[in-house]
Regions:
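Carbohydrate transferase catalytic cores enriched for Leloir-type hexosyltransferases
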Residues: 1-349
């Protein structure tokens, strides 16, 4: 019998130094794309790890499969190497693609010269050597072009998505909230508390908006100073996080700088009304499915918006209805297909 057409297999090396342990949005992104990419028979994958970083078992566990090839050095026969971790962290002669999630080390440079160099060097290496740079928003594309001096022809926008667990409430067993929040109205903040997250503005605005303490302010990570009425639900898993979104009277995202904004998309997917700062990539992701504060640092504007939305069930209902439809416009399958197309293109250059 005649043989069928043979697949032209592209050998991709992946910088996997952080694959098993990164619990941030970057790790979620890398695992979401790679678990889907591994199903494509046109590609062969080698995961490059280093001393003291995850070995084969850890990478296999992170990707949910034993069919992984792991190496300590970039294979000589790799056609392309992908760096998912916000820049390039090792040198290689293999043609490379790097993902840049934001340009925060340049927008908010450290005052310490050594720390600044450590934070910025992977971005500079990317700007100097990567054949293509993947970003998740037009905002980040503009940041990479203007802050790093990259030709826009080298930049490809591949919007992210959210996992299927982030959905509106379904019929069946009701969500079980942490005991501290049961029977209470609460505003939810999801994420870290570094400078650009602007949590201090939210805390100050919340205190002005709800001085009687009849509304709780819930955090998924402990802020530097826990305000009156503050509740910490530390590091919830995805199922617990989805329940927190669904139970929230409002999700508040005051960040002044986001390359994409996972919490915004997750909240919308769960049908939670969202109030966010009109900053960074957040408006690009949220569109008309979120309410916006124009000046991210304006405490009075935040307080007024919090009060108004908590008092207006109809307005929050409109946002809750728009959110899932907006979130459905984002797809991991499309993000993966776009990523693979770029890797294939660079391997063929």
């Amino acid at each position: 019998l005649p043989e069928g057409p043979r697949l032209n297999v592209v050998h991709v090396a992946v910088d996997a130094h952080n694959l098993a342990r990164d619990d941030r949005g970057i790790g979620r992104y890398a695992r979401a794309v790679l678990t889907r990419a591994l199903r494509d028979e046109r590609f062969r994958w080698t995961f490059v790890v280093r001393d003291l970083f995850p070995k084969r078992a850890a990478v296999a566990h992170a990707l949910g499969t034993d069919a992984v090839e792991v190496a300590r050095r970039v294979p000589r026969d790799a056609g392309v190497m992908w760096f998912p971790w916000n820049g390039m962290f090792l040198r290689t002669d293999v043609p490379s693609v790097a993902t840049v999630h934001d340009a925060a080390p340049f927008a908010f440079p450290s005052g310490d010269a050594r720390k600044r160099a450590i934070e910025q060097n992977p971005f500079l290496a990317t700007a100097n050597t990567a054949r293509r740079i993947l970003v998740q928003s037009r905002f980040t594309a503009d940041e990479v072009e203007h802050r790093l001096g990259v030709d826009p022809e080298r930049i490809v926008v591949t919007p992210l998505a959210v996992d299927s667990i982030f959905t509106p409430a379904q019929s069946g067993a009701p969500d079980v909230l942490p005991v501290e929040l049961r029977g209470r109205r609460y505003v939810l903040h999801v994420g870290a508390h570094d400078e650009r997250k602007n949590t201090g503005t939210l805390i100050a605005a919340f205190a002005r908006a709800f001085p009687a303490g009849d509304v709780a302010l819930a955090f998924t990570r402990r802020p530097p100073s826990l305000p009156a009425g503050g509740v910490v639900i530390d590091a919830p898993d995805d199922a617990a996080l989805a329940a927190l979104y669904r139970g929230a009277a409002l999700v508040a995202l005051p960040s002044t700088y986001e390359g994409f904004g996972f919490p915004l998309l997750e909240a919308m997917a769960c049908g939670a009304p969202v109030l966010a700062a009109r900053a960074g990539a957040l408006p690009e992701v949220g569109g008309d499915a979120a309410a916006w504060v124009d000046d991210a640092h304006d405490v009075e504007a935040w307080a007024a918006a919090l009060r108004a939305l908590l008092a207006d069930d109809a307005a929050r209902g409109v946002l809750a209805a728009r959110g899932p439809a907006r979130a459905a416009e984002f797809s991991w399958e499309r993000c993966t297909a776009q990523t693979l197309a770029v890797l294939e293109e660079v391997a063929a250059l």
